[in-house]
Amino acid sequence: MVAVASSSSAASAPRSGEEIREAFLNFYAERGHKRMASASLIPDDPTVLLTIAGMLPFKPVFLGQQERPAPRATSSQKCIRTNDIENVGRTARHHTFFEMLGNFSFGDYFKQRAIEWAWELSTGVYGIDPKNLVVSVFREDDEAELIWRDVVGVNPKRIIRMDEADNFWASGPTGPCGPCSEIYYDFKPELGDEDIDLEDDDRFIEFYNLVFMQYNRDAEGTLTPLANRNIDTGMGLERMAQILQKVPNNYETDLIFPLIQAAADLAGVDYHQLNDKGKTSLKVIGDHSRAVTQLICDGVTASNLGRGYILRRLLRRVVRHGRLLGIDKPFLVTMGEAAIALLKGAHPSVIERQEVILAELQREEARFLETLERGEKLLAEVLASKPTQISGAQAFELYDTYGFPLELTQEIAEEQGLAVDLDGFEAAMEEQRQRAKAAAVSIDLTLQDAIDQVVADQAATCFEGYEALDHASCVQALVVNGGPSTTAKAGDAVQVVLDTTPFYGEGGGQVGDRGVLAGSDLIVRIESVSRSRDVFVHAGRVERGELALGDTVKAQVDRACRRRAQANHTATHLLQAALKQVVDPGIGQAGSLVDFDRLRFDFHCPTAVTPDQLQQVETLINGWINEAHALQVQEMAIDQAKAAGAVAMFGEKYADVVRVVDVPGVSMELCGGTHVTNTAEIGLFKIVAESGVAAGIRRIEAVAGPAVLAYLNERDVVVKQLGDRFKAQPAEIVDRVAALQEELKATGKALAAAQAELAVAKAGALAAKAEAVGDFQLLVERLDGVDGAGLQGAAQSLADQLGDGAAVVIGGLPDPGDMGKVILVAAFGQQVIAAKLQAGKFIGGIAKQCGGGGGGRPNLAQAGGRDGAALPGALDAAQAELTSAFRAL
């Protein structure tokens, strides 16, 4: 029999989340398991967006695609799941971010030892009374039941057989699979052992799952025993914390509740005094704050695609639930700081990445608050009409016009007991797609259709361009002037398919080669090369002679162009390596362009790269160039390449055998492009621009090799022209421009002051025109040729002269010759404000008559418009509206 808990072991059992995690890892480390660090939430697996299970990092090992790290391993793996996000905060145990404790055997121990250790850990280390435990087994797994009953000593009534849907694990329709056994905690053992229903979530919680991988399933569904059987287990850290800390749900454990308390403090509420709706919002904030912090830490940035969209959705849910609690100011950074403080012990990388995490939280919250304010206003108008549902058209308007996520509309509607017409939403989305198609510029698809037609019948082109730039090739297909053909003559635009080619076809960000196809009295100038289904299509024009199907031609790549493309491509690899070293190791490629004269690299990064960092990157790259690193290019299995540390672009599909381009000690990437043989061939590298191209995506543009000299020569010309213009030496230009800017600034201030004085002087004569309306002094006048600051000064001066009952409105054209710009200002005294009239609201409404708007403080405000012809009518309206308001008082 396996040892069970005693009262003393229960008293000394781990309690905190940190202790529970460490106890698990130590228990298995003492039993020969290698402690493995948590893998990133961004998995090295193109089939999933995020790490969703503790076994995912070991999946290649279980599938026989990768060498095992050790016969036995144990880990605490960070995981994210969002498939049931709507249940977060509403149930006791649903989360987006969670930690999965696991022990793994790769062809080492199997079922009996896994069961014995799981029981020993649960009862002996964690001190759980066996009376509180129930186990499940697969309905056909007699072996597991016997071990639980006869070896461990579990009461047979507390061993429950389950169907395949619950207790049989498979990696997919085919492949390794096997039965599993789960351990449940019973919160109500006093109810006895009869008619146990493990689906009763109020009574039972599953906390430890043991998977026995012992079969291989083929396409026919036949199960064959595996030669090497494996163990894959998972224990939910948050669930065990709930059990040992004796709290009603996972959220009230020390792993999450500090974040709930932080949110409650921000909202000024007491968690324990809130209703269920309020508690749910706090739980969502607590859960999601952990998730977004870990996602950003591992390199995810908010976007509208893939895992970036998951991050954005979680962030926006946090903000919205904060608003439901009355938090009307930005607070994500505060929650991020609280999450970092909570997570840093087990996950020190959050401290290393703190600046990046907080910057992304701040940026995305600011972006969403604008969206939320617009969308909530429109949605409130919709709900005010008390509809039976939110129509598809309304949901689409929120999405399309205001950037309001459909999921958020669904959540808000659900809170009001309403549904969203999803079919109508999809119909509106499809209508927009069709409108976009109809409005788009018509594209002549005849050429592409012709190319597709000839390519469909061709075998893959044999590419010889890594080793040779000249090759004798046979013409396999021709497209001439937009249609399939057997011949092409001088002057014809032509697309040529060859059996073998030295020309690189556009791909991987690199442009296709240029060159010629030559023969006896034949020249075909090739301007670009593309690929379609591994068939290379050479596009160009026949300059001399005639080309026919079956001809043998000499395919010659333009060597100068190829050299420049090679230099730029290798420089792009060096750029990514330098960015990882200088800016952030988590930087990942989002796209690239390798042209003959320039290169462009897009990468995931939440903030702009600073000028100092750009200088460091540039210096580092030129240092690697000067060090003359010889490149090593080889083909190897994809798993071997990744194990060696080769960088792959996420989302890119790779073959089983890949090409690895290695700059030893600097960079190693999977790449099918062409490269220099030594970094010294690049010559020079120069960054010319850094910018943002999308949310969380930065772009660096650069030149390399001879293009650097051309770039510097252009800059020299500009510097010389500036020097001549400002009569200054190159080193003096910056100071000279700065001095001129200061002079201009001072002149501008003096001019503004003079204009303000002039406006006040002009206004002085207007005070006598004020009209007494009851206890108020009303003055509405036009004053052209004065800017906004001048009009404000004049209005305020007049209001001061007229006293507390003053209401002054002045409108004018700052440039009397420009009818497209109107300025309106209002200045109200305290007596007017006390009568519930505010300058900001009033002048904003008047400005609408001039096609504009604006506002400001209750006592002084400015608005603008675009229709000067409407100004007289707007001033008349102001006079009438204020007169009526004053007489009504």
From Swiss-Prot:
Catalyzes the attachment of alanine to tRNA(Ala) in a two-step reaction: alanine is first activated by ATP to form Ala-AMP and then transferred to the acceptor end of tRNA(Ala). Also edits incorrectly charged Ser-tRNA(Ala) and Gly-tRNA(Ala) via its editing domain. InterPro entries: aa-tRNA-synth_II/BPL/LPL (IPR045864), Ala-tRNA-lgiase_IIc (IPR002318), Ala-tRNA-ligase_IIc_anticod-bd (IPR018162), Ala-tRNA-synth_IIc_core (IPR018165), Ala-tRNA-synth_IIc_N (IPR018164), Ala-tRNA_ligase (IPR050058), Ala_tRNA_ligase_euk/bac (IPR023033), DHHA1_dom (IPR003156). One of its GO terms (biological process) is alanyl-tRNA aminoacylation. One of its GO terms (molecular function) is alanine-tRNA ligase activity. It is found in: Cytoplasm. NCBIfam families: alaS. It catalyses: tRNA(Ala) + L-alanine + ATP = L-alanyl-tRNA(Ala) + AMP + diphosphate. GO terms for cellular component: cytosol. Its cofactor is Zn(2+). Its main location: cytoplasm. Binds 1 zinc ion per subunit. Belongs to the class-II aminoacyl-tRNA synthetase family. It comes from Synechococcus sp. (strain CC9605). Zn(2+) binds at H569, H573, C671, H675. This is Alanine--tRNA ligase. Its EC number is 6.1.1.7. The keyword Iron does not apply. Keywords: Aminoacyl-tRNA synthetase, ATP-binding, Cytoplasm, Ligase, Metal-binding, Nucleotide-binding, Protein biosynthesis, RNA-binding, tRNA-binding, Zinc. Consists of three domains; the N-terminal catalytic domain, the editing domain and the C-terminal C-Ala domain. The editing domain removes incorrectly charged amino acids, while the C-Ala domain, along with tRNA(Ala), serves as a bridge to cooperatively bring together the editing and aminoacylation centers thus stimulating deacylation of misacylated tRNAs. SMART domains: tRNA_SAD.
